[in-house]
Regions:
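Hydrophobic transmembrane alpha-helices and immediately adjacent juxtamembrane helices
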Residues: 4, 8, 16-17, 21-310
Length: 310
């Protein structure tokens, strides 16, 4: 099964960069006018409008190749756990051990009700794992795909979608921990959980928006991933993951200054049975829009140089 998937993925990647015949020619004709060899274009004389147009074509071409991105992301997971007995569920098992040990320990140290704290930390750990995974993988989304980018006609945005797919699959595996903990402690979010769906959509948009500039900057400056990793470690402790927001008391409003908190709350609160406040949503939407604007501007500026930085 793995061999067939790998063969199909390799064939799909190779098929983008070589002339097609027969039925494949029809697909090539449909894709090539829009995506072309856009990953390897570098024209110093381009105007800002032309750079923006090529960047939009790159994103649009990547979205049209979502099946390839899905296959590559799934293949990354399969290859990472090749030969393993539990496969990706090793990550689920390690998350479950972390949640149970930290949950009992911190509930005892901070004198909190374990029935309230354990579901909170289980959900927080899993959701934070997705956020930190996207940021970490986004830093290397282009450098790890160096061979493909430098040799195959493919939009750069495919590598961003690949990161998103890979982390969504890992989030799906870790969601088992949330389901089990919620069942053990009789947590029933009710219809409020539906508010998590637009939150996940906002997450996907923000994830794509953060991966593009991070991938480009880290391709140019190879020390940036280590800096980002250190920042994420600090953000873990500054964000209510292992501690509750109401523990700040009268200073709880300061959490709004933490962008990770705003994005985390629009998914976490509905799954805990309470809808996030309007001020949380406004902050999360504002953060997402700012990320998208910054990402578009930077990607349009440096997109043509990425392949030469690898």
């Amino acid at each position: 099964m793995l061999g067939r998937v790998k063969t199909n993925a390799v064939a799909a990647v190779r098929g983008i960069g070589r002339p097609a015949t027969g039925s494949a020619a029809f697909m090539s004709d449909r894709l090539s006018p829009s995506i072309g060899n856009i990953a390897l274009e570098f024209r110093p004389g381009l105007t800002a409008t032309e750079r923006a147009r090529f960047a939009v074509q790159d994103v649009a071409g990547g979205l049209r190749l979502w099946r390839l991105a899905w296959t590559l992301g799934w293949l990354d997971i399969r290859l990472r756990y090749r030969g393993s007995l539990l496969g990706p569920f090793w990550l689920t098992l390690s998350t479950a051990i972390m949640v149970s040990s930290l949950g009992v320990l911190y509930a005892t140290l901070m004198h909190m009700d374990v029935h309230r704290y354990l579901p909170f930390i289980a959900l927080s750990q899993v959701l934070w794992g997705f956020i930190s995974g996207v940021v970490g993988d986004g830093c290397v989304c282009f450098t790890q795909a160096e061979g493909i980018i430098r040799s195959v006609r493919m939009p750069l945005f495919v590598q961003v979608l690949r990161v998103l797919v890979r982390n969504l699959l890992m989030l799906g595996h870790n969601a088992v921990v949330i389901v089990v903990v919620f069942a053990l402690f009789s947590v029933r979010p009710g219809w409020q959980a539906l508010w998590a769906l637009p939150g996940v959509a906002a997450w996907a948009l923000a994830a794509a928006a953060i991966c593009l500039p991070l991938g480009a900057v880290c391709a140019r400056f190879r020390d940036v991933p280590q800096i980002v990793g250190s920042v994420m470690q600090i953000a873990f402790f500054l964000t209510p993951i292992i501690w509750l927001p109401d523990q700040l008391g009268p200073h709880e409003h300061l959490l709004l200054l933490n962008p990770f908190f705003d994005l985390l709350e629009i998914v976490r609160e509905p799954l805990l049975g309470t809808a996030a406040g309007s001020h949380i949503w406004m902050a999360a939407v504002a953060i997402t829009l700012v990320l998208c604007g910054f990402s578009c501007a930077l990607f349009a500026r440096v997109r043509g140089r990425v392949a030469f930085w690898l």
